[in-house]
Amino acid sequence: MILLAAKGLSLLDVNPGLVVWTLITFLVVVLVLKKFAWDVILKALDERAQAVQNDIEKASELRLEAEALLKDYEARLNSAKDEANAIVAEARSDALKLKNKLLEETNQEVKAQKDQAVKEIELAKGKALEQLQTQFVEMTITIAGKVLEKQLKAEDYKAFIETELNKLGKLSA
């Protein structure tokens, strides 16, 4: 550039001979490329375009498969949740039934024990009344014997007192 400026030439000056040779060289290069490399370059570009198109189609297919799998997994998850909820509900129901059954059995046992206790109390009461009656008869005989200062036969007097007490018991009942 400095040399061109020293000679008084500018870079923007057009030299017609240089233009012709540049055009001829360009056309020769284009013809050589067309003859030997153009088909190879176009083929490579077409292959690359086809590969890109195949990759796009494959990605689209994979996306569709992924969406289908996601829907399937979501359906399975919802099914599993429903099944788990059903199992929990069944377990609650079974627990409630068991609780009610145990309460019923416990109530029956308590009632049976209460009935048994009432029977035992009635039996003990009867025995106590019988013992009281026997003691009362014996005391009456002893007192009557002392009052009369005469001893009667204990069995005769005892039978008489028991008969009278039974009459009194029937009247009070």
From Swiss-Prot:
Q: How does it sit in the membrane?
A: Single-pass membrane protein
Which InterPro entries does this entry report, sorted A to Z? ATP_synth_b/b'su_bac/chlpt, ATP_synth_F0_bsu_bac, ATP_synthase_B_chain
Please indicate if the UniProt record lists S-adenosyl-L-methionine as a keyword: no
List the GO cellular component terms.
plasma membrane; proton-transporting ATP synthase complex
| GO MF entry, a single one | proton-transporting ATPase activity, rotational mechanism
Q: Key word Ion transport present in the record?
A: yes
A Pfam family assignment: ATP-synt_B
CDD domains referenced in this protein's UniProt entry, alphabetically: ATP-synt_Fo_b
**Record's subcellular location:** Cell inner membrane
Record keywords = ATP synthesis, Cell inner membrane, Cell membrane, CF(0), Hydrogen ion transport, Ion transport, Membrane, Transmembrane, Transmembrane helix, Transport
| Protein origin, superkingdom | Bacteria
Q: What HAMAP family does this protein map onto?
A: ATP_synth_b_bprime
How does this chain assemble? F-type ATPases have 2 components, F(1) - the catalytic core - and F(0) - the membrane proton channel. F(1) has five subunits: alpha(3), beta(3), gamma(1), delta(1), epsilon(1). F(0) has three main subunits: a(1), b(2) and c(10-14). The alpha and beta chains form an alternating ring which encloses part of the gamma chain. F(1) is attached to F(0) by a central stalk formed by the gamma and epsilon chains, while a peripheral stalk is formed by the delta and b chains.
Similarity comment: family membership: Belongs to the ATPase B chain family.
Summarizing the function annotation, the protein's role is: F(1)F(0) ATP synthase produces ATP from ADP in the presence of a proton or sodium gradient. F-type ATPases consist of two structural domains, F(1) containing the extramembraneous catalytic core and F(0) containing the membrane proton channel, linked together by a central stalk and a peripheral stalk. During catalysis, ATP synthesis in the catalytic domain of F(1) is coupled via a rotary mechanism of the central stalk subunits to proton translocation. Component of the F(0) channel, it forms part of the peripheral stalk, linking F(1) to F(0).
Give the protein's recorded name.
ATP synthase subunit b
Give the encoding gene's name: atpF
